[in-house]
Structure formats: C-alpha cells, structure tokens
Regions:
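Catalytic machinery of carbohydrate-active enzymes
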Residues: 1-211
Length: 211
C-alpha cells in the first residue's frame, strides 16, 4: 500500500502510464455484441455499480440505496445499463427491470472469482458510473470515461477538497461528491447530466496542491 510514495514523488507523476489494464479483446467484443442485442437493440452501454466494499457500516457509508440509484437509470435513447456490481446484484437488477429500466445482469460473470472476465465486461462498456469500489479501479485502469459517486467517507486517495473534480490516479475518472448538507442530491444531478451528455471524458483539477 505504500509503494506509491517511492514510485511517484508528485501528483503530476500519476496517470501518465495509461492504460494500466487491458482486457481480452475477443471476450470484450463478444460481450459487447450480446449486450447491445439484448432485447431491444441499443447503441451504447453504461456500466454501473452502486454498492461499496468493506465490512459492516463501511459498506453502507460507501453505497447508494438501489431505489435512489434507480433515479440515474431512467431511460436515455439508445442507452443500456450493465451491472458491474460484485456480490448478489441479481435481485436488485430484477427489481429495476420490473420497473421498466433497461439494465442487464449477466449471471455468468462473478467479479469476485473471474477477474479477467469481469474486466472484459467493464471494457465492453462505453462508460462507467459507480460508487468508489473496485469498479472504479477497473474502469480507470482501462481508461474508460467514468464518473465516481464519491462518499463523504472516502479515504485519502481521493482528497477531500470539493474543488478536485478528477482523479489523479486515473485521468478518465471524474468525481461527483456526496455533500454534508445536501447528501447525494447534487452528485446525482451531476451524474444524470453527465449521462445525458453522452458521458464525456472528465476535465478539471486533479489536486489542490501546488504543482
């Protein structure tokens, strides 16, 4: 966990050697074709993850309730959402689908046991929207346009300055922060706008530290 202090001496040193990860192209292409043709054909795939990792209260602190996250999944022409969530995500996706939301859960992919297959699933997506968990690191390592819904209880890697709107680890990862007073409302609004604008690559400062 402390290797970065020896390898990188300044914030500007991060993010210069991307992509850090590469998926198997044949598996990536296969999954993408299947997902786009699932039901009514779609044009774009957005990977999603709403539950954080850890133990006990830490999971709750990093997560967004499914009924709240569903607000982000309201239909956008040509867009299909793909669950990248590890753990027992199937029942939640089934509930969303009953509500008419276009979300896929691929039961063949277990991120906790099949990391290579899961990474191909992430790479099959055009963009990713996720809370801060392994999904962010997979998407960021691939260089996929990503928006991180960042909890107030985030750790040192993300900085706590609200002026920081992009990850210095992964230049393709933007940050929408939970706020002390407003909760998730402003971050959710920011995320929905990002989705409707086609999930552009993020811009903005990666640090409030002097260069």
């Amino acid at each position: 966990g402390s290797i970065c202090q020896h390898r990188y001496k300044a914030v500007q040193s991060y993010g210069r050697h991307l992509p850090l990860l590469k998926a198997k192209p044949e598996r990536q292409d296969q999954l993408r074709r299947e997902y786009l043709q699932h039901g009514q054909p779609a044009e774009r795939l957005i990977g999603i993850s709403w539950r954080g990792g850890g133990k006990g209260v830490r999971i709750q602190q990093k997560s967004i309730l499914p009924e709240q996250f569903a607000q982000l999944l309201q239909p956008i022409p040509g867009v299909r959402f793909v669950s990248l969530q590890y753990g027992n995500a199937g029942p939640t996706v089934a509930q969303w689908r009953q509500q008419g939301l276009d979300v896929i859960h691929d039961g063949r992919v277990d991120p906790l046991k099949q990391m290579d297959l899961w990474l191909a699933q992430v790479a099959a997506c055009d963009a990713v929207l996720s809370v801060a968990n392994t999904t962010i690191h997979g998407a960021g390592g691939l260089g996929t346009p990503t928006l991180c819904l960042l909890s107030l209880h985030s750790d040192w890697r993300w900085f706590h300055d609200p002026a920081v709107t992009r990850s210095y680890w992964y230049p393709s990862v933007g940050i929408a922060r939970e706020q002390k007073q407003a909760g998730w409302s402003e971050a959710m609004a920011q995320a929905r706008i990002w989705l409707e604008q086609g999930c552009p690559q993020p811009s903005g400062p990666v640090s409030s530290l002097p260069a």
